[in-house]
């Protein structure tokens, strides 16, 4: 895991590395923060809680959702379906136009969501508009009339791999400039513990001051998104919803909001616990993926099939949880959240060395796969430079169009840098740009392309791929997902598991 520049305060690493100390440090964030808080955001007017509760229970509360992407759009649809009047705000006017026109904007798997939103629009329960300029008169701004504002904006990494809260801060400034008192504000973006009560609340304050307004009195809470692109919507709806408030009243009204749309709402007792829980969920997954990825490299050196090892180990009914290896990690959370977790630990004097190591292992996988492909070609008398490589899959996971942090894009850059001639195939992706600036336009998979390639590199295990055709026609298949294992006897030395 890369670190901040050596001359930055964050680069001064503490020596402590006790995981229990790290969790205790996070716990201290929420100790004593409930009772007696005098911050204006924590002190709505007496009776405001009852009024908001009533509006939430009878569905008359007006809801604004800032950010209409993979998190905000499904959330807006769910709340509109529960009976609320929902306004979606997004900084991309073209996205707003397409959503308003009933078009799917989250890939081909989002047609059902697009139809649902179109129905809510027709019934007057959902509308979407581009985020207005901050200097728009308060009375005309859509946030001025809302009772609930939910923030679902990206929380990426800065170039030095530290948390980038610029989108969260921009949302806070917008809210501060326009929200009325006694509004419920919920942050859903994944972030480190203390953000809601700290950086986010500070941004709201700054927005108030910049607009010449007195300090706001708001309900403030955190409820982490748990969206899983590609998951069946009926399964996604059953995922429990965590809620943590900055005060007991804030948590209570937030629970009431989400209970209207989620079958299982879990209060955590504080915003910090909810923030840390979301991070830890993804750190847990990242660490276990790193473990099986490292096991793959070790077992490969021994000539042992890691997938057969995992299948055998998974027969134990206790004490083992199978994770699958791959070409690296992708998506909007898993590759990023460990860095947020480790950075937050450093701010409290604790170094999360195990988490850092997991990040290093996962980020190294595209390099290892490239080396494995190069070695497989050389064993057959072919150099990687000048070789025709057919890359199957650009999305970061099966059966989605999501390219965020996809290891496939890193792999393509490495292959191009090595001098390979690369053709890509992905039935869910129309075009893509690699981190190195290469413009990709995937083509359909057919027998001729398989036969013409010096090597076929399986990166994403899309169900649309014709596995028997690949097994029959590929001269060399380097499989990072294990989808061709069933054809190992047929393929013989033409199959390399990586």
Regions found by a protein language model. Give the residues of each.
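Structural/interface elements that position substrates and couple domains in central-metabolism enzymes
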Residues: 2-498
């Amino acid at each position: 895991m890369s670190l901040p520049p050596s001359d930055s305060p964050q680069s001064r690493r503490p020596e402590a590395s006790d995981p229990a100390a790290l969790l205790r440090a996070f716990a201290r964030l929420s100790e004593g923060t409930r009772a007696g808080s005098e911050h204006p955001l924590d002190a709505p007017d007496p009776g405001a809680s009852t009024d908001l509760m009533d509006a939430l229970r009878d569905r008359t509360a007006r809801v604004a959702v800032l950010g209409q992407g993979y998190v905000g759009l499904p959330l807006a649809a769910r709340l509109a379906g529960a009976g609320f009047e929902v306004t979606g705000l997004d900084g991309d006017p073209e996205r707003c136009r397409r959503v308003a026109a009933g078009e799917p904007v989250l890939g081909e798997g989002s047609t059902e969501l697009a139809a649902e939103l179109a129905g809510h629009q027709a019934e007057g329960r959902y509308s979407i508009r581009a985020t207005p300029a901050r200097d728009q008169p308060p009375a005309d701004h859509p946030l001025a009339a809302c009772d609930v504002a939910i923030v679902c904006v990206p929380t990426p990494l800065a170039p030095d791999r530290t948390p980038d809260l610029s989108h969260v801060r921009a949302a806070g400034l917008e809210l501060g400039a326009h929200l009325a008192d006694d509004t419920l504000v919920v942050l859903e973006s994944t972030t480190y513990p203390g953000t809601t009560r700290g950086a986010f609340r500070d941004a709201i304050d700054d927005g108030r001051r910049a607009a010449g307004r007195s300090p706001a009195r708001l309900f403030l809470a955190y409820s982490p998104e748990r969206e899983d692109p590609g998951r069946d919507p009926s399964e996604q709806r059953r995922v429990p919803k965590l809620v943590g408030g900055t005060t007991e009243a804030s948590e209570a009204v937030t629970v009431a909001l989400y209970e209207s749309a989620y079958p299982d709402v879990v209060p955590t007792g504080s915003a910090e616990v909810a923030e840390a829980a979301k991070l830890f969920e993804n750190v847990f997954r990242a660490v276990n993926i790193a473990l099986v990825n490292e096991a793959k490299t070790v077992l490969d050196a021994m000539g042992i099939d890691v997938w057969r090892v995992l299948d055998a180990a998974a027969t134990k009914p206790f004490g083992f949880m199978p994770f699958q290896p791959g070409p690296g990690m992708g998506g909007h959370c898993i590759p990023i959240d460990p860095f947020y977790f480790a950075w937050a630990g450093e701010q409290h004097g604790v170094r999360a060395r195990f988490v850092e190591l997991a990040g290093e292992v996962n980020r190294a996988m595209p390099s290892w796969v490239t080396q494995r492909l190069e070695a497989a070609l050389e064993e057959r008398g072919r150099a990687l430079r000048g070789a025709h490589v057919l890359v199957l899959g650009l999305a970061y996971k099966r059966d989605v169009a999501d390219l965020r942090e996809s290891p496939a894009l890193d792999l393509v850059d490495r292959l191009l840098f090595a001098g390979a001639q690369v053709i890509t195939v992905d039935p869910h992706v129309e075009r893509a740009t690699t981190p190195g600036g290469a413009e990709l336009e995937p083509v359909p998979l057919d027998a001729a392309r398989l036969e013409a390639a010096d090597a076929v590199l399986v990166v994403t295990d899309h169900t649309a791929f014709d596995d028997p055709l690949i097994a029959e026609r590929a001269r060399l298949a380097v499989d990072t997902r294990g989808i061709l294992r069933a054809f190992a006897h047929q393929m013989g030395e033409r199959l390399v598991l990586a």
